[in-house]
From Swiss-Prot:
PROSITE patterns: GLOBIN
Residues carrying N-acetylserine: S2
SUPFAM superfamilies: Globin-like (SSF46458)
Gene3D superfamilies the record matches: Globins
Residues with the Phosphoserine modification: S53, S73, S82
Organism: Capra hircus
Residue stretches making up the Globin domain: 2-142
Official protein name in the record: Hemoglobin subunit zeta
GO biological process per UniProt: hydrogen peroxide catabolic process
Length: 142
């Protein structure tokens, strides 16, 4: 699956706004993930998962930074996220379905923060992009 030129433009345009609010977007995305998919909490037994905790904010920032790495390497997401894929597959052993759950939560968060920008076309482009990211993160599981 590859992105069209229009989809890339949409992703890059919205990313310029997301990147200025990375900590807020990341924290809210994780809070949404743990609320909607509480089984994901099992991967964070050492974290304070209360709303707005320092650990949640820090990890949320890391998540959005990883998405940013993928955006910056939009034509080669595989190389940008290879080490992260290895970490999640071999060390953390995260169930791959959680990447889809996280992607969905990020889409909802983006829609709530950027309602004017998150058009149907933007939703479709970001959904496709995050599917690519999720696919890359699960490559090492095969």
């Amino acid at each position: 699956m590859s992105l069209t030129r229009t989809e890339r433009t949409i992703i890059l345009s919205l990313w310029s706004k997301i990147s200025t609010q990375a900590d807020v977007i990341g924290t809210e995305t994780l809070e949404r993930l743990f609320s909607c998919y509480p089984q994901a909490k099992t991967y964070f037994p050492h974290f304070d998962l209360h709303s707005g905790s320092a650990q949640l904010r820090a990890h949320g920032s890391k998540v959005v930074a990883a998405v940013g790495d993928a955006v910056k390497s939009i034509d080669n997401v595989t190389s940008a996220l290879s080490k992260l894929s290895e970490l999640h597959a071999y060390v953390l052993r995260v169930d791959p379905v959680n990447f889809k759950f996280l992607s969905h939560c990020l889409l909802v968060t983006l829609a709530s923060h950027f309602p004017a920008d998150f058009t149907a076309d933007a939703h479709a482009a970001w959904d496709k992009f995050l599917s690519i990211v999720s696919g890359v993160l699960t490559e090492k599981y095969r």
